[in-house]
Curated annotation (Swiss-Prot):
Family: Belongs to the WD repeat ARPC1 family.
InterPro entries to which the protein is assigned, alphabetical: ARPC1, WD40/YVTN_repeat-like_dom_sf, WD40_repeat_dom_sf, WD40_rpt
Position of the signal peptide: none
Source organism: Xenopus laevis (African clawed frog)
Gene Ontology MF annotations: actin filament binding
Protein name: Actin-related protein 2/3 complex subunit 1B-A
Protein localization: Cytoplasm, Cytoskeleton; Nucleus
Function: Component of the Arp2/3 complex, a multiprotein complex that mediates actin polymerization upon stimulation by nucleation-promoting factor (NPF). The Arp2/3 complex mediates the formation of branched actin networks in the cytoplasm, providing the force for cell motility. In addition to its role in the cytoplasmic cytoskeleton, the Arp2/3 complex also promotes actin polymerization in the nucleus, thereby regulating gene transcription and repair of damaged DNA.
Length: 369
């Protein structure tokens, strides 16, 4: 596992380019920094400055090499690289609250933006007018949209929001794509059609994710639950109440395996059993070093109380690689079908790249199916 600390500021969101040689992230500010790997070091090569509010979402299209960003200024920008300079194009989202998340569609001909306006903006490029326009998905969203993920068919869109619901909508835009083929989630897909709505969550839905096939959707909530809906099993929902602090992000790494992370500062593996319809804990992927678990002596305890007016509980350092909450997960190589590497960024200003095979060999009982 390779860990790199970029800054002291928290990393609120990130995105990788196609060959995973460059990473774009927001250091909890109005700007986006782009770093390039140079041997074992990372060097800053670009700084994107256009937003006048905190950047809340970044996505990097692998084929067209365009970056889309959104922020609390209620705007989105599409960035295009010309002569080694990133040029922004403003996208009017027609919202009156902060944008919270953004995702390119698989075919990169549109993108979705979730916001505090209780709606999702589906943005696409109009060739005739030479600008980006958007359509809104509103009903039945009743609160801020916190996370988005596209189905592989480029039409269905998963959304998690702070009204305790995860949903799947049709984001079919007839101007830019052909009529979609039927899926296990449904056959009729006019724009804005609600294909699925969860009822099992009792907390804000922080993250949603489709599997590689698109037949399963997973989500994590602030009540420390992780859930999966399987469209091939009549949209059966399987949930697991975890013993961790709330999870903030989740991704499939195979069709039956998921990695999630959040306030516990380490990634966790979960296994879905299709036959049994169960979700189980697969193991912690960041084992603490036992040598550093030494207790304090009575003398040290009283010295701390005398000098710092603090107890020993305030002086325990985390043994995980990340020293603060993990805010985002992304698959680096192998895709969601058979991930070989994934990346985490956190509020400690650090980024870690995890090698799946190395994790399997380092942990005896770990089996990723």
């Amino acid at each position: 596992m390779a860990y790199h600390s970029f800054l002291l500021e928290p990393i609120t969101c990130h995105a990788w380019n196609k060959d995973a040689t460059q990473i774009a992230f927001c250091p909890n500010s109005h700007d986006v920094h782009i770093y390039k790997k140079d041997g074992d070091k990372w060097s800053k090569i670009h700084e994107l400055k256009e937003h006048n509010g905190h950047v809340t979402g970044i996505d990097w299209a692998p084929e067209s090499n365009r970056i889309v960003t959104c922020g609390t200024d209620r705007n989105a920008y599409v960035w295009t690289l010309k002569n080694n300079v990133w040029k922004p194009t403003l996208v009017i989202l027609r919202i009156n609250r902060a944008a919270r998340c953004v995702k390119w569609s698989p075919k990169e001909n549109k993108f979705a933006v979730g916001s505090g306006s209780r709606l999702i903006s589906i943005c696409y490029f109009e060739q005739e007018n030479d600008w980006w326009v958007c359509k809104h998905i509103k009903k039945p969203i009743r609160s801020t949209v916190l996370s988005l993920d596209w189905h592989p068919n480029n039409v269905l869109l998963a959304a998690g929001s702070s009204d305790f619901k995860s949903r799947i909508f049709s984001a079919y835009i007839k101007e830019v794509e052909e009529r979609p083929a039927p899926t296990p989630w449904g056959s009729k897909m006019p724009f804005g059609e609600l294909m699925f709505e969860s009822s099992s969550s009792c907390g804000w839905v922080h993250s949603v994710c489709f599997s590689h096939s698109g037949d399963r959707m997973a989500w994590v909530s602030h009540d420390s639950t992780i859930c999966i809906s399987d469209a091939t099993k009549k949209m059966r929902v399987t949930s697991l109440i975890t013993d961790t602090l709330p999870l903030l992000c989740v991704t499939f790494i195979t069709e039956n395996s998921l990695v999630a992370a959040g306030h516990d500062c380490f990634p966790v593996l979960y296994i879905y059993d299709e036959a049994q319809g169960t979700l189980s804990f697969g193991g912690k992927l960041d084992i603490p070093k036992q040598s550093s678990q030494r207790g304090m002596t009575a003398r040290e305890r009283f010295q701390n109380l005398d000098k710092k007016a603090s107890s020993d509980t305030n002086n325990i350092t985390l043994d995980s690689l990340h020293k603060n909450s993990i805010s985002q997960l992304s698959v680096l190589s192998g895709g969601k079908a058979k991930c070989s590497k994934f990346c985490t960024t956190g509020l400690d200003g650090g980024m870690c790249i995890w090698d799946v095979k190395s994790l399997e060999s380092a942990m005896k009982d770990l089996k990723i199916k």
